[in-house]
Every structure is written in structure tokens, then in C-alpha cells.
């Protein structure tokens, strides 16, 4: 296993180890979250974890949870989420995030905002001084409104483009049946204000700014052959 892959496994394992029996767990989406689900499933199968329920944030995490024997539930069926574990595309020094590279940010925000503790798992390349400097901001929009929303985003200083699918003709379609505009901002210095401004645009379902939600970030780091996980 190469050092980078090893690091991702260690971060995922560290996150999965924080889940305790009897908890309701929010399952994130993406490559590191997928590894976390695998380790969580291992703990369920060997009897280390009992009586847990998981709320998936995407079709991907739902399929993985079923594959690894993790009992699933839904937001509407639980009165709490004890812990949510998810990845991120960017993390700033205040632990604000950009998420949505997998077009799952709407359901992710629903689950992560509900959680008593929200843990983010990333590698050090995702740490930035200001959001928007390395990753476009995803905005989920109603299909019939994407042009109108795009013009409104331009007035906010953004440069939107419709996310296109790789293995199908046409745009990416979210689990909710909507489209995604990826918006370039030179730098997002006031993420809370921008999050609200974008969500106030008619036709927007949700954007990928996660402000004030994160309780802990687990950062995987590689130094030569040495792999470590630190908290912030």
C-alpha cells in the first residue's frame, strides 16, 4: 500500500473508532468516507459495535452500508444523530468547508447539521487559507432554473458553469433529480454571508458552503513513508 492510500485508511479508521454502540451515525460520501464505512462495517461484523443505526447521505453511502452490514435508517425516522463523519473538498482555519464534489452536499448538510458531533476526515491537501481558492463552489439548482440562477450568481461575483457528466451524455443529476452549478469565486472571505445570499436565490436548493457546523477535523499527513493523523 502506497503512503497516500495508507494515510487515507488511517484517517478513516481513526474516525470509525469514535463510533460507539447504540449510536445513530451519519454516513458521509466520497473516497475517505467510503473507507470509514468499511471500517465501521468491520466493527459491526466482529461484534465490537452493536445496536447502531446509520443515516446515509447519498446513494453511494447507502449501497456501501448495505454491503458491509450496517443497519440503515432515515432522517425522518430518528430523533437524533449522535455523530456524523464526512469528507470535504476544502477546509479553512475556522473549520468551515466546501463540500459537494460528489454532488451530495444537500443531503450531507441535512445530516451533518443534525448531528451532535460532526467530524470531517481529510488529507492535508484540503486545508486552505480561504475557501474557494482551490475548489469550485457547488450549487444544487432546479433544472428549469439553472440559467436564471446562474445569472444571479454572476451578480454575486461568481462564474458558474453547469457540471457535466463523465460517463453519460448531458449534465450531472443529483440524487434529488436536480442539476449542479460549479461556481468560481476568487476567494470567499465571508462564507456565512455568501451561504445565505446563494440560498436566497429562487431555484437554489442548497450550496456547498458548510459554515459553523464542524466540531473536529481529522487530518491525514504523509512525511516520506511516515503516516500520521492529527486533530484540529
Curated annotation (Swiss-Prot):
Name of a matching Pfam family: Rib_5-P_isom_A
GO molecular-function terms, A-Z: ribose-5-phosphate isomerase activity
EC category name: isomerase
Pathway the protein contributes to: Carbohydrate degradation; pentose phosphate pathway; D-ribose 5-phosphate from D-ribulose 5-phosphate (non-oxidative stage): step 1/1
Superkingdom, natural source: Bacteria
GO cellular component labels: cytosol
Enzyme Commission number(s) of this protein: 5.3.1.6
GO biological process: D-ribose metabolic process; pentose-phosphate shunt, non-oxidative branch
UniProt entry tagged with the keyword Metal-binding: no
Enzymatic reactions: aldehydo-D-ribose 5-phosphate = D-ribulose 5-phosphate
Keyword ATP-binding applies: no
Enzyme active site: 108 (proton acceptor)
Keywords: Isomerase
Family, as annotated: Belongs to the ribose 5-phosphate isomerase family.
Subunit text: Homodimer.
Annotated protein name in UniProt: Ribose-5-phosphate isomerase A
Organism: Synechococcus sp. (strain ATCC 27144 / PCC 6301 / SAUG 1402/1) (Anacystis nidulans)
Amino acid at each position: 500500500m502506497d503512503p497516500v492510500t495508507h494515510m487515507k485508511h488511517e484517517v478513516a479508521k481513526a474516525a470509525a473508532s469514535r463510533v460507539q454502540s447504540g449510536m445513530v451515525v451519519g454516513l458521509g460520501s466520497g473516497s475517505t468516507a467510503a473507507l470509514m464505512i468499511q471500517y465501521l462495517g468491520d466493527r459491526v461484523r466482529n461484534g465490537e459495535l452493536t445496536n447502531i443505526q446509520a443515516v446515509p447521505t447519498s446513494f453511494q453511502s447507502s449501497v456501501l452500508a448495505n454491503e458491509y452490514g450496517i443497519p440503515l435508517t432515515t432522517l425522518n425516522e430518528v430523533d437524533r444523530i449522535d455523530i456524523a463523519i464526512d469528507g470535504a473538498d476544502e477546509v479553512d482555519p475556522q473549520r468551515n468547508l466546501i463540500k459537494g464534489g460528489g454532488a451530495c452536499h444537500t443531503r450531507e448538510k441535512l445530516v451533518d447539521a443534525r448531528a451532535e458531533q460532526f467530524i470531517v476526515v481529510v488529507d492535508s491537501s484540503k486545508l486552505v487559507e480561504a475557501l474557494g481558492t482551490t475548489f469550485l463552489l457547488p450549487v444544487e439548482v432546479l433544472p428549469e432554473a439553472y440559467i436564471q440562477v446562474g445569472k444571479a450568481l454572476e451578480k454575486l461575483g461568481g462564474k458558474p458553469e453547469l457540471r457535466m457528466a463523465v460517463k453519460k451524455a448531458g449534465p450531472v443529476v443529483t440524487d434529488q433529480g436536480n442539476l449542479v452549478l460549479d461556481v468560481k469565486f476568487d476567494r470567499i472571505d465571508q462564507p456565512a454571508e455568501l451561504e445565505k445570499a446563494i440560498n436566497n436565490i429562487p431555484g437554489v436548493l442548497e450550496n456547498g458552503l458548510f459554515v459553523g457546523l464542524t466540531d473536529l477535523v481529522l487530518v491525514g499527513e504523509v512525511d516520506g513513508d511516515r503516516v500520521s493523523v492529527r486533530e484540529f
